Amino acid sequence: MEVVLIFVYSLLVPVVLASAAKEKEIDPFHYNYQTLRIGGLVFDVVLFLVPSCHLLSHRCKCSFNQKPQDPGDKEAQVENFITANAKEPQKAKN
């Protein structure tokens, strides 16, 4: 019985050594932290500058500078324009 156990354990020794050798292999994936850091900083700068330039260029059509208009204001302007034109005397064409 002891001889059988020694034989079985002797068969397991190469398996254990092979698994230990696999653990010592260098991981082929290597993090390049410097490039990752620079890329992140560039991304942050772009995300900061694009909206800032957009707001500073005054092309943003923000509504805080405009007065609120009533829906009837446009119609009132058209009616005033029509009545103003009707009051002017028409010139005779000769």
Swiss-Prot record:
Name this polypeptide is given: Putative FXYD domain-containing ion transport regulator 8
Pfam family, one: ATP1G1_PLM_MAT8
Subcellular location(s) per record: Membrane
Cytoplasmic topological segments: 59-94
Gene name of the encoded protein: FXYD6P3
Origin: domain of life: Eukaryota
Family listed: Belongs to the FXYD family.
Taxonomy of the source species: Eukaryota, Metazoa, Chordata, Craniata, Vertebrata
Organism in which the protein naturally occurs: Homo sapiens (Human)
Keywords carried by this UniProt record: Ion channel, Ion transport, Membrane, Signal, Transmembrane, Transmembrane helix, Transport
Single Gene Ontology BP annotation: positive regulation of sodium ion export across plasma membrane
Major subcellular location class: membrane
Record-level Gene Ontology MF annotations: sodium channel regulator activity
Region entry Disordered, spans: 66-94
Family annotation (Gene3D superfamilies): Single helix bin
Bilayer topology annotation: Single-pass type I membrane protein
Extracellular side of membrane: 19-34
Annotated signal sequence range: 1-18
